[in-house]
């Protein structure tokens, strides 16, 4: 209080600490923006750095986006579904086979009660000769093999028709060339020979092989069918004096007469188709044979069992044994007398 000056005429800034030159020099160096900024004034805009954006609420729904890697439980579910589908498929197949076996068993029982009559070839009732074989694909052949056996049956029929047309082709060739009498005669012989022999020698063994799953009959079919395929190739070739309207004979006949040559070319094409289809079906039957579990060892066992169980063979063996024993006894008795 001692420093307080009551003189009204004295300089008011004399004792003012804020008027010190060192203080006023520092205050003059403040940036001009701070002097002009008034925090309580609304007329002036705040500096750009101090402006804050309002918080906008997120309007998107809270959905979890799937990642690239699927969870482990998804893969397990898929594997379980595939395994279940496979089991259902196998179950349906087993049920179908069981139903087929039941149906075949009932039909076999009906046939055993009423007798199994031959129905092939389908001849009229008043014909002097009756059917020789029994054939029913739905009864004898399993479902998975019926289509193949039917195709082989149709192939046999196709070859028989081709042999029948071959007779007319050789006849037409003989009409324009009198030196082809041998071909015409052989064409008749081939039709009468190959039609029944092919049915008995390779088709019936195939039918019986699929009917009873016989390995021995499969091997009989393969052996005979290879020979049959060789016959198809020779017939398609058509060598002279062999009784076939093959390609060689067709070209020769075409030089003699164009209509006859065209007819022979058609027959040669049928023989060629028989050879090609025979090769395709041979591969198909061989593939099915590999899936049936047949083998050469089983064929040997079936052959031995069939031979030993055959009554004719048993009778012949017994007669041979008795004859040998009788002759041995007689020789021994004569030796003792001497």
Swiss-Prot record:
Residues 2-155, 203-218, 283-338 are cytoplasmic. One of its GO terms (cellular component) is zymogen granule membrane. Keywords: Acetylation, Endosome, Golgi apparatus, Membrane, Phosphoprotein, Protein transport, Transmembrane, Transmembrane helix, Transport. It is found in: Golgi apparatus, trans-Golgi network membrane; Recycling endosome membrane. Residues 177-181, 240-261 are lumenal. One of its GO terms (molecular function) is protein domain specific binding. It holds the Pfam family SCAMP. The chain crosses the membrane at residues 156-176, 182-202, 219-239, 262-282. One of its GO terms (biological process) is protein transport. Its main location: Golgi. It comes from the Eukaryota. The modification Phosphothreonine is found at residue 45. InterPro entries: SCAMP. The modification Phosphoserine is found at residue 2. It is a multi-pass membrane protein. Residues 1-64 are annotated as: Disordered. The modification N-acetylserine is found at residue 2. Interacts with SYNRG, ITSN1 and SLC9A7. Belongs to the SCAMP family. Functions in post-Golgi recycling pathways. Acts as a recycling carrier to the cell surface. This is Secretory carrier-associated membrane protein 1.
């Amino acid at each position: 209080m001692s420093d307080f000056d009551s003189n009204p005429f004295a300089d008011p800034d004399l004792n003012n600490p804020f008027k010190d030159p060192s203080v006023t020099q520092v205050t003059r160096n403040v940036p001009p923006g701070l002097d002009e900024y008034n925090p309580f004034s609304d007329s002036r805009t705040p500096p750009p750095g101090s402006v804050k954006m309002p918080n906008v609420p997120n309007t998107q729904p809270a959905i979890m986006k799937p990642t690239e890697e699927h969870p482990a439980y998804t893969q397990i579910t898929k594997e379980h579904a595939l395994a279940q589908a496979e089991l259902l498929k196998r179950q349906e197949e087993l049920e179908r086979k069981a139903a087929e076996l039941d149906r075949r068993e009932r039909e076999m029982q009906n046939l055993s009660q009423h007798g199994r009559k031959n129905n092939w070839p389908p001849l009229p009732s008043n014909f002097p000769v009756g059917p020789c074989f029994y054939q029913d694909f739905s009864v004898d052949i399993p479902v998975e093999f019926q289509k193949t056996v039917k195709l082989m049956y149709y192939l046999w029929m196709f070859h028989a028709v081709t042999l029948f047309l071959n007779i007319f082709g050789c006849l037409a060739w003989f009409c324009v060339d009198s030196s082809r009498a041998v071909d015409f005669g052989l064409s008749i012989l081939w039709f009468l020979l190959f039609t029944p022999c092919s049915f008995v020698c390779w088709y019936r063994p195939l039918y019986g092989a699929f009917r009873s799953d016989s390995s021995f009959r499969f091997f009989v079919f393969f052996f005979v069918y290879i020979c049959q395929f060789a016959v198809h190739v020779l017939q398609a070739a058509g060598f002279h004096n062999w009784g076939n309207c093959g390609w060689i004979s067709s070209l020769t006949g075409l030089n003699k007469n164009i209509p006859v040559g065209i007819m022979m070319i058609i027959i040669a094409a049928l023989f060629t188709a028989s050879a090609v289809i025979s090769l395709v079906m041979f591969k198909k039957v061989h593939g099915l044979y590999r899936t049936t579990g047949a083998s050469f060892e089983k064929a040997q066992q079936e052959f031995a069992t069939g031979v030993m169980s055959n009554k004719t063979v048993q009778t012949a063996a017994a007669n041979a044994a008795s004859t040998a024993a009788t002759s041995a006894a007689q020789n021994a008795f004569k030796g003792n007398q001497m």
